[in-house]
C-alpha cells in the first residue's frame, strides 16, 4: 500500500467505544454496495467489518440482515449512511473536478476508503487524520487486499483533541492552496468548545477557494429520542449506545460562525437528498435523524 506514514503506539482502535461506530458505518457501506439500486460503492467496507473481532458476525449484505429493509438498523440506518456516503463523495469529486481543488483533508477519517475507491486526478493529495489505532487497523486490512490509493495519500495518526493542525502542516499540507475539508460523522462526539476550535482551525488553514462539508445534530435534547427505533435497535443488536457516545452539550452554530468569517454556507436535511436521489430515508415519528444536518461551505476566491 503506497504512501503510508509511520504510526505511533496508541492502541485506541476499532474494537470499542467510538471506534465501533466506524465499523457500523463500514457495515452500512457494505450493505449499500450490494444493493441493486446502490447509491455508493465501497468494495473495501465488508473487509473492514469481517476483519474486526467485534463485527465479524455482522451482516454485510441486506439479505443476511435480520429484518432486511424493514430493520431500523440494517434497513433505514444503513441506507442513511449509504446516502451520506454518496452525497459526500459527490462533494469531494465536485471540489476536485469542478472547483480545481487538489488538496483534500479527511478529519476523523475512520474507515473511509475514498482515497482508494474514488476516481481522483493524479495530482491530488488526500490527508487522512484519525487516531493511530484506527489507522493501524485500516492499514492491516488494506494491506491484505494489496489496495493502492488513486492519488497520493498521507495518513496522520493523531487525536483530533491534540495539535492535529501542527501534525497536518508537518506532513506537507499547504495552507496557501485551496482545500476540500470533510468532517463526516465526527462532530456528534465533540463538546461545544472542541467543535468551535475545529471549525476555527479549518477556517485558519483554508485559502480562498476552499470548501468544507460536515455533519451536525441540532436536537436540543438528544435523550428525547432514546426510545427511537434506530437507537434502540443499534443498542440491542450491536451493543452500541450512540447516545452515550454523543456529546449532550448545546451545539454551536458553526454555519453562522463560518458566514461571519466570509464563507457561504448552506444547511440541508438528509431528506433533501433522499428526494433528490429518489431513495434513502424519509422522516418518520420519533425520528433519531430529525436533527441531522449536512452543511456545505465555501470560501470564495478573490474576484
Curated annotation (Swiss-Prot):
Its EC number is 2.1.1.-. GO terms for biological process: methylation. It is an enzyme of class 2 (transferase). S-adenosyl-L-methionine binds at residues 130, 159-160. Keywords: Methyltransferase, S-adenosyl-L-methionine, Transferase. InterPro entries: Ppm1/Ppm2/Tcmp, SAM-dependent_MTases_sf, SAM_mthyl_Trfase_ML2640-like. It holds the Pfam family LCM. Exhibits S-adenosyl-L-methionine-dependent methyltransferase activity. NCBIfam families: mthyl_TIGR00027. This is Putative S-adenosyl-L-methionine-dependent methyltransferase SCO6443. It comes from Streptomyces coelicolor (strain ATCC BAA-471 / A3(2) / M145).
